[in-house]
Amino acid sequence: MAQDRKKVLVLGAGYAGLQTVTKLQKELSADAAEITLINKNEYHYESTWLHEASAGTINYEDLLYPVEKTVNKNKVNFVVAEVTKIDRNAKRVETDKGVYDFDILVVALGFVSETFGIDGMKEHAFQIENVLTSRKLSRHIEDKFANYAASKEKDDKDLSILVGGAGFTGIEFLGELTDRIPELCSKYGVDQSKVKLTCVEAAPKMLPMFSDDLVSYAVKYLEDRGVEFKIATPIVACNEKGFVVEVNGEKQQLEAGTSVWTAGVRGSHLMEESFEGVKRGRIINKQDLTIEGHNDIFVIGDCSAFIPADEERPLPTTAQIAMQQGEHTASNIKRLLNGESTQDFQYVNRGTVCSLGANDGVGIVYGRDIAGKKAAFLKKVIDTRAIYKLGGIGLAFKKGKF
């Protein structure tokens, strides 16, 4: 009977949550469960493309599509609402649009920027966090060029961009900027030699997930296109002028018209309010992706701190891991609905590619280093495959990179 259907509630339509739902609707009949997906926006956005929209090399509309295009309305109830409280013991979720009970819960609420308490960073630096922040940043950068061109008293600092962080997001954003800056200079008649791009990183090495050879390739590629790197240089504050850094124990002011922070993300702030043992918005999972004490609550994606059985540290938060967790969670939910035991999650690392603009990149694919146009092509394949897995061939054809 319909009233006896178990209530499966999925929070978040990012890579992890949407992958869970799309697999569930493929594998379950309409009367197998009452599936509800709650997301604060009516759209899903490709968060791995945010660096492109932030630089302005793609339009912000290119990276989003309606969630309704991916869900089967006969099997999934999609609700646009913001989650305000998760009561794990009462098995109830509160939103700004109403209250939802659950028998099985999937928490996939995504990430927000983490500034690690650096003074002034939230107030004075742009964050690459979502569609709105990316749109705001790209418009700001173009406005700086337009205003510089129109100004009689020109200040070259208006054309300077500081990027905090030399991890994935920071390097990919810089790569896009090296594509975008020549376009802006041509559009507004600006001398490109006046533009200054500076990347500041506290760690002694950028892109720590890659070999020294790949890092050297990426550094040379970006330096040849005007990027200056300040490695092993911690940012201690951010103000209206730019970053304050520490060099040899002394503080120095780096000035720029645009400051961008890319060096940290954390899981949703709701995690600390809803669960115990949460650090930076992430909770340690059991091997089947549920959490301690709750065999019917799965936490996946950016809110998950999954530690494989033979390892000591949690897996990083990547789209590849999130989608694999989503698929596995859907399979485990099906098992629970059938009265079966869940199975442990096994992550398959197929590789990682970091783009350097549209036509270059570095990466590791099944343990093998790749660089150049081959890496750039593979990045486009990965991006398009993600859309295909979530929305099917039609959406991949419309929104993919080919």
Curated annotation (Swiss-Prot):
GO terms for molecular function: NAD(P)H dehydrogenase (quinone) activity; NADH:ubiquinone reductase (non-electrogenic) activity. It catalyses: a quinone + NADH + H(+) = a quinol + NAD(+). Binds 1 FAD per subunit. The active site is at residue 172. Pfam families: Pyr_redox_2 (PF07992). Keywords: Cell membrane, FAD, Flavoprotein, Membrane, NAD, Oxidoreductase. The keyword Nucleotide-binding does not apply. GO terms for biological process: aerobic electron transport chain. Its cofactor is FAD. One of its GO terms (cellular component) is plasma membrane. The keyword Repressor does not apply. FAD binds at residues 12-16, 39-40, 83, 302, 319-320, 379. InterPro entries: FAD/NAD-bd_sf (IPR036188), FAD/NAD-binding_dom (IPR023753), NADH-Q_oxidoreductase (IPR051169). Its main location: membrane. Belongs to the NADH dehydrogenase family. Alternative, nonproton pumping NADH:quinone oxidoreductase that delivers electrons to the respiratory chain by oxidation of NADH and reduction of quinones, and contributes to the regeneration of NAD(+). This is Type II NADH:quinone oxidoreductase.
